Amino acid sequence: MGVFGSNESSSMSIVMYPWLAFGHMTPFLHLSNKLAEKGHKIVFLLPKKALNQLEPLNLYPNLITFHTISIPQVKGLPPGAETNSDVPFFLTHLLAVAMDQTRPEVETIFRTIKPDLVFYDSAHWIPEIAKPIGAKTVCFNIVSAASIALSLVPSAEREVIDGKEMSGEELAKTPLGYPSSKVVLRPHEAKSLSFVWRKHEAIGSFFDGKVTAMRNCDAIAIRTCRETEGKFCDYISRQYSKPVYLTGPVLPGSQPNQPSLDPQWAEWLAKFNHGSVVFCAFGSQPVVNKIDQFQELCLGLESTGFPFLVAIKPPSGVSTVEEALPEGFKERVQGRGVVFGGWIQQPLVLNHPSVGCFVSHCGFGSMWESLMSDCQIVLVPQHGEQILNARLMTEEMEVAVEVEREKKGWFSRQSLENAVKSVMEEGSEIGEKVRKNHDKWRCVLTDSGFSDGYIDKFEQNLIELVKS
């Protein structure tokens, strides 16, 4: 075992092995930083390709050690593929096969390190190799508790007939005892979850792997808080008959050497009045696949009349966002609108005083960043988990509005314009209601002791688990 001893101030030896995606590795590293801050030692397993991107985020290099793992070449994957960034979505199951094939190397590492704790989320076989060396296992989930409760608990199992896709009505059914009638999917939205139960040769379904991962661990951990998702966490705990530990949002805190907002954006935003700019960002993955959908988004923001900044990947078929812009758009919005295809410092933009509205896809990280900001929130979720996050924010917390869309999944420029104006125009009843509710939640979530309190409790849970 590690150097963890009889008193609670001793250091635990921890191994982290997240799914091979930056959207998973980064939150795992943020949690590693929180635990290292308390003196615990972490060995972080990751592909070689991920090292350069994650190394700068390691705040405690004396306590967090990166250990690169060789990702085997699996037939059907692009040459050299190591993370989900290298792989189209429809081949993700082959990346899971490659991860499964790292088991012998990971087992050797475990035997050498003899950790007290192992954190994982996808590699369901981790408990099988951790138990013989006496290590406790924690399945750490970086998605919302609501999405787990709806689709990744034993009661959510679906009978899948080979070769037959389930209907939207079948996919939209909530499992027995599911604790909400509001945070649900409509049949046409639920189709985006069909991949969860789809069977693949060699690895079965995503559902099988994830349920096995949570069923066999010693404890489940979720990156959320009881104030927002308590009833979903309790439901998950009952479904698996084991403890569910909550870490809180685990967002990176301000650091002494944290960079300031890129001068390009700081200077541009400074030209506008307080709270007048609409900021639109849809995360690091391509979201808007068709040029006509991309153009509807641009035209909808133009028609609001507000200044706007958009950070979005180009749609399919073009290499830059400029190629996809509507005819005459750039000239019409010059001076008040920018569409940018690169990476942008989202938390810093949200905290700029000129920004008053955030149009988001409602990924879980963006959800927390929006809640902790002072911006009005407009949501354009794209698939299952994001839609559930949006329903949590609009139907239960009532802090945001969701853009109305057609059954085929996209929205019109008019529906986007209406949603933005409903929260930004003075005297709007909807705008006043969501701002009032958002202010209450922001006060709770940004309280100086809120996040620290969750990490303190989480650490105590881990200490008790290791001692048990």
UniProtKB/Swiss-Prot annotation:
Pathway: Secondary metabolite biosynthesis; flavonoid biosynthesis. It catalyses: an anthocyanidin 3-O-beta-D-glucoside + UDP-alpha-D-xylose = an anthocyanidin 3-O-beta-D-sambubioside + UDP + 2 H(+). One of its GO terms (biological process) is cyanidin 3-O-glucoside metabolic process. Disruption phenotype: Strong reduction in anthocyanin accumulation. UDP-alpha-D-xylose binds at residues 284, 344-346, 361-369, 383-386. Pfam families: UDPGT (PF00201). One of its GO terms (molecular function) is UDP-xylosyltransferase activity. CDD domains: GT1_Gtf-like (cd03784). Keywords: Carbohydrate metabolism, Flavonoid biosynthesis, Transferase, Xylose metabolism. InterPro entries: UDP-glycosyltransf_plant, UDP_glucos_trans, UDP_glycos_trans_CS. It comes from the Eukaryota. Transmembrane segments: none annotated. Its EC number is 2.4.2.51. Gene3D superfamilies: Glycogen Phosphorylase B. Contributes to the last few anthocyanin biosynthetic steps. Converts cyanidin 3-O-glucoside to cyanidin 3-O-xylosyl(1->2)glucoside. Can use 3-O-glucosylated anthocyanidins/flavonols and uridine diphosphate (UDP)-xylose as substrates. Belongs to the UDP-glycosyltransferase family. This is Anthocyanidin 3-O-glucoside 2'''-O-xylosyltransferase. It comes from Arabidopsis thaliana (Mouse-ear cress).
